[in-house]
């Protein structure tokens, strides 16, 4: 397995990882996905568009239209 990056943990039964822009209430099917590194659960982390795990406060801001 590949080493996990900053703010990631190896998880045998991964769930739905939240991405920047998604909130805690985003629906998720309760099923295991293949083992992989995921953003540290329960710590308010989100996956950015370029694959990094960052705190919600560091998610890129959407530009107004």
UniProtKB/Swiss-Prot annotation:
Domain TIL span(s) in chain numbering: 4-59
Domain of life: Eukaryota
Record bears the keyword Disulfide bond: yes
GO molecular function list: serine-type endopeptidase inhibitor activity
Keyword Disulfide bond found: yes
InterPro entries assigned: Ser_inhib-like_sf, TIL_dom
Site for Reactive bond, residues: 30-31
UniProt keywords, alphabetically: Disulfide bond, Protease inhibitor, Secreted, Serine protease inhibitor
Disulfide-linked positions: 4-37, 13-32, 16-28, 20-59, 39-53
Subcellular location: Secreted
Effect upon mutating residue 65 to E: In inhibitor 3
Annotated Gene Ontology cellular component terms: extracellular region
Family to which the UniProt record says this protein belongs: Belongs to the serine protease inhibitor-like (TIL domain-containing) family.
Entry function: Defends the organism against the host's proteinases.
Protein name in UniProt: Chymotrypsin/elastase isoinhibitors 2 to 5
């Amino acid at each position: 397995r590949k080493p996990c990056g900053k703010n990631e943990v190896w998880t045998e039964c991964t769930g739905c990882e939240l991405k920047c822009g998604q909130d805690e209430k985003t629906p998720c099917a309760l099923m295991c996905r293949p083992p992989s590194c995921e953003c540290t659960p329960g710590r308010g982390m989100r996956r950015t568009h370029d694959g990094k795990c960052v705190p919600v406060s560091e998610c890129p801001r959407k530009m107004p239209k």
